[in-house]
Regions:
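Conserved beta-strand scaffold positions in the cores of enzyme catalytic domains, especially
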Residues: 38, 68-70, 88, 117, ...
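Helical element adjacent to the flavin cofactor pocket in flavoenzyme catalytic cores
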Residues: 49, 56-61, 83-141, 145
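Flavin (FAD/FMN) cofactor-binding core of flavoprotein oxidoreductases
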Residues: 45, 74, 78, 222
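Helix-loop-beta segment of a Rossmann-like dinucleotide-binding subdomain
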Residues: 3, 30-40, 75-105, 109, ...
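Active-site substrate-recognition segment that forms the wall
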Residues: 18, 26-34, 124, 135-176, ...
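N-terminal FAD-binding dinucleotide-binding subdomain shared by FAD-dependent oxidases/monooxygenases
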Residues: 54-61, 68-76, 84, 97, ...
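Generic structural signal for well-ordered, non-membrane alpha-helical segments
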Residues: 6-17, 47, 51, 95-99, ...
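Dinucleotide-binding Rossmann-like beta1-alpha1 core, especially the glycine-rich loop
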Residues: 1-73
Length: 222
């Protein structure tokens, strides 16, 4: 059923994180990959029951403490130290990474194995594959890895809603300040608010921080 499918999908997502780390190491891809887990901090008292409820839901789906657990404030502060901290949830199944360098490294790895990567090739999804000016590519499955930009493809404008995510990044932060902030294992982080935020400590000691506060633009405009 739908629930079982969701659980299988989540377990596959967990497996993918470790597998990606193995590939990065085997191929020598310099992308700052560190699997330090992710911590979701409760920075308001009202966020505590919401985060604990998400842990209970995971437990009922068959995930244990090794997958997702609650941290009391003192333990949570060893991961990240915001000005207010009422506890946090923590999962080890997450990694910090530079996505652009990861993609370029993966492309180079498959090219070394004889795969041809075609760039700057316009394509249009049609039944049974992808049409290009140079010919038809036939495939049983087509992965539309274009995120919100799918709305700019012919016939796709109303099939997805583009959701924006804006990011900022600091200059390199000195070690003395990181001692106050935390993230010593390069944990990724968020908090329990309804608005999605996220961040990570980069390989060169910057803080990369983002959120989903940007508005939807009328007509699925980009």
């Amino acid at each position: 059923d739908t629930r079982d499918g969701m659980v299988r999908t989540y377990r596959e997502m967990i497996r993918t994180v470790s597998e990606m780390g193995e590939v990065v190491a085997a191929e020598g891809i310099d992308c700052g990959f560190v699997q330090g887990g992710t911590v979701v901090a409760a920075t308001r008292a009202g966020q505590v029951p919401r985060l604990k409820a998400s842990i209970d839901l995971a437990n009922r789906a068959g995930f244990g403490e090794s997958d997702l657990r609650w941290l009391e404030p003192a333990e949570a502060a060893r991961h990240v130290a915001p000005s207010r901290l009422f506890g946090a949830s923590f999962t080890p199944h997450c990694a910090a990474v530079d996505p652009a360098r990861l993609v370029l490294g993966l492309a180079a790895a498959v090219e070394r194995r004889g795969v041809v990567v075609y760039e700057r090739t316009p394509g249009r999804i049609v039944p049974g594959g992808v049409w290009t000016p140079a010919g038809m590519i036939r495939a049983d499955r087509v992965v539309q890895a274009v995120e919100a930009y799918r709305t700019q493809l012919p016939g796709q404008r109303r099939r997805v809603i583009p959701v924006y995510s804006l990011m900022v990044m600091t200059a390199p932060i000195p070690a003395t300040m990181w001692g106050q902030v935390g993230l010593g294992a390069r944990e990724t982080f968020s908090d329990g608010r309804h608005l999605i935020i996220y961040g990570q400590r980069t390989a060169d000691d910057r803080m990369a921080f983002g959120g989903r506060g940007a508005p939807y633009h009328y007509g699925s405009a980009i």
